[in-house]
UniProtKB/Swiss-Prot annotation:
Residues 20-46 are annotated as: Disordered. This is Heptahelical transmembrane protein ADIPOR1. Residues 112-179, 238-240, 296-303, 366-376 are extracellular. It is a multi-pass membrane protein. The gene is ADIPOR1. GO terms for biological process: negative regulation of abscisic acid-activated signaling pathway; response to hormone; response to salt stress; response to sucrose. One of its GO terms (molecular function) is signaling receptor activity. Pfam families: HlyIII.
Length: 376
């Protein structure tokens, strides 16, 4: 019995030596909490890293010639904060965000001509915006020369000073401004929805699809509202043509948005189909444009407005060409990931086209203020 007990004791000791040492009990207090927080931070850091094109989920694969610096399925807060970091959407976001700020500034300036409270607000709060709008106008030169009288407000401008920049005469008061403000509002909606899409579509598949549809809607709205100032003011004395042309382009815009609500058309392979829908909407303006030229053949400002509208059309068509061909990144994949790729060029040309159309709208309004309509 004694020998058996000794053998059992030795065997137990042998197994104890082979057994792994027990893990030390977690320290009481904040040590374990700190470790857990550090682990969570590390996980979040890994989640929010920039990834390559091949690491993206299929729904985010839009341009295979941009190889790196993608945000993929980031938390919404991190996506928002990426506004201030460098990735392949940074310039896309800021071009249209700054464009929105510019058009917002122009809208506030023009509202100030009719509402003294807005004019006072410009004097106290909006000096930087008005200066940006003024500087952009002067840098563009002749293309925006027609808008110069709108930009003379000083930082302390009052309602009287605003009115002096563009006197609201009796004729002007009779010429409604709502089509002009419809254009400005549509431009702001397009630019802001585009910036939001590029900023937040990296969050999830569901939000990506929603924001892409919002972006397409913004483009369609921009095209539709661009028709309002020229058609309304050129055909102000012939209301039936106002109704015909504005109804037609609005219906075309609604039909285009409805077609683009299909998730299938959001896929990258339908890029050309989407672009052609928008181009068709824009080119539908050839008919009212030809009619307008015929009606105003002897109007001395005809060539000025045609130059502005030609600049707008050239900007939009060139932007569409970059969007479709994906040049220059197609030539050197990876070289233009962060700066200089086609979508960034497209964004810059959209801003240029919108500003050219803004200048044309100013000329249309001034011409209508001076001419009025002949007595029946």
């Amino acid at each position: 019995m004694g020998e058996e007990a000794a053998m059992a004791t030795m065997e137990s000791a042998y197994h104890d030596e082979l057994a792994p040492a027990a893990a030390p009990a977690p320290a009481k207090g904040g040590g374990s909490k700190k470790k857990r927080k550090q682990q969570k931070r590390e996980e979040k850091r890994k989640e929010c890293r920039l990834v390559s094109y091949h690491e993206l989920p299929d729904y985010m694969k839009e341009n295979e010639f941009i190889l790196d610096y993608y945000r993929s399925e980031w938390p919404i807060l991190n996506a928002l904060l990426s506004l201030f970091s460098w990735h392949n959407e940074t310039i896309n976001i800021w071009t249209h965000l700054l464009g929105f700020v510019l058009f917002f500034g122009l809208t506030v300036l023009h509202l100030g001509q009719y509402f003294p409270q807005v004019a006072d607000l410009i004097g106290h709060l909006s000096w930087p915006i008005s200066k940006v709008a003024e500087n952009v106008s002067s840098n563009i030169g002749d293309v925006l020369s027609g808008a110069a009288s709108f930009m003379q407000a000083s930082p302390a401008s009052s309602a009287g000073a605003m009115a002096a920049a563009w006197p609201v005469t009796a004729a002007a008061a009779a010429t409604t401004r709502w089509p002009f403000f419809v254009f400005l509002a549509g431009a702001m909606f397009c630019l802001l929805s585009s910036a939001a899409c590029h900023l937040l579509s990296c969050h999830s598949h569901r939000l990506n699809l929603f924001l892409i549809r919002l972006d397409y809607t913004g483009i369609a709205v921009m095209i539709v509202v661009s028709f309002f100032p020229p058609i309304y003011y050129i055909f102000q004395c012939e209301p039936r043509w106002q109704v015909v042309y504005l109804s037609a382009i609005t219906a075309a815009g609604v039909a285009t948005v409805y077609a683009l609500m299909s998730p299938r058309l959001s896929a990258a392979r339908y890029r050309a189909h989407r672009a052609l829908l928008f181009v068709a909407m824009g080119l539908s303006g050839v008919v009212p444009a030809a009619h307008a030229v015929a009606v105003n053949w002897h109007e001395p400002r005809r060539n000025v407005t045609l130059a502005y509208e030609g600049a707008m059309a050239a900007s939009y068509l060139a932007g569409t060409a970059f969007y479709l061909t994906r040049v220059p990144e197609r030539w050197r994949p990876g070289m233009f990931d962060l700066c200089g790729h086609s979508h960034q060029i497209f964004h810059a040309l959209v801003i240029a086209g919108a500003l050219a159309h803004y200048a044309a709208a100013i000329v249309f309004i001034q011409a209508r203020d001076e001419m009025g309509c002949p007595a029946p």
